[in-house]
Structures are given as structure tokens and as C-alpha cells.
A protein has these predicted regions:
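STAS-typified acidic loop motif
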Residues: 3-40
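Short acidic-hydrophobic, aromatic-tinged amphipathic segments that line or gate anion-handling sites
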Residues: 106-110
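Amphipathic alpha-helical interaction surfaces in cytosolic regulatory modules
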Residues: 29-105
Length: 118
């Protein structure tokens, strides 16, 4: 199976089921080629208690993609909010573990589990 690592990144933003929750759902590879829209999204998002980054639709992430995820986490924390990643594939989890990002960013197995952290 050949994985497209330079395709477009789709970003969908919606309110979660739990009040005060924002869900950012990504679909496509998260790479240097397409991180800029996600960076802008993190900078412009509302101040809510919980931001959930749904990576279920992300087949591949490079170091630049990981960097923008960490920056999103830092941005949320700086405003007093929580940041949780869900749908982290084994491939992306391996990247997070290798760089110790898994010790910094909270992860949940499902969207419902992440919303319970609000």
C-alpha cells in the first residue's frame, strides 16, 4: 500500500457535545506542506476549557506536523485550557513516543473519553 504523504489536509472545526469543548478534526497527512492552515486555526480559536484534536483521519505526520500539534497544545495551556489528542494511530504514537511528546500531550482513545476530561 502506497501512502500519499503530500496530499491536502482538511480541517473541520465544531463544538463538542460537552459545553466548552472545541473539536478540530483533521483528515489527510499533516506535513510541512500543509501545516499553515492548522497553525492559523490554533491562533484564532476561541478560548474554551477543552480543545480536542482528532487525528483519526491523519495517516502520516512529519516533524513539522508534530511541531504544530505541540504549539497548539502550548497555545491552549497558555490560555488556561486543556488539549487532548484522540484517534492517534500506532504510527503517529510511535513518533510521539520517540520524541517524548506522549509525556506532554494528553491522549484519549475516543472523542467521548476526551470530552469526559472537560
Amino acid at each position: 500500500m502506497v501512502m500519499a504523504i503530500d496530499g491536502p489536509l482538511q480541517i473541520d472545526v465544531e463544538r463538542g457535545k460537552t459545553p466548552g469543548t472545541l473539536v478540530i478534526r483533521l483528515t489527510g497527512p499533516l506535513t510541512l506542506r500543509n501545516i499553515f492552515d492548522l497553525q492559523a486555526q490554533f491562533r484564532s480559536m476561541e478560548e474554551l476549557p477543552l480543545t480536542i484534536l482528532d487525528l483519526t483521519g491523519v495517516p502520516y505526520m512529519d516533524s513539522a506536523g508534530m511541531g504544530v500539534v505541540v504549539n497548539g497544545h502550548v497555545h491552549c495551556q497558555g490560555r488556561g485550557g486543556k488539549f487532548v489528542a484522540v484517534g492517534v494511530s500506532s504510527r503517529i504514537l510511535a513518533l510521539f513516543e520517540m520524541t517524548h511528546v506522549d509525556k506532554v500531550i494528553a491522549m484519549a482513545p475516543t472523542l467521548e473519553a476526551a470530552e469526559a476530561l472537560a
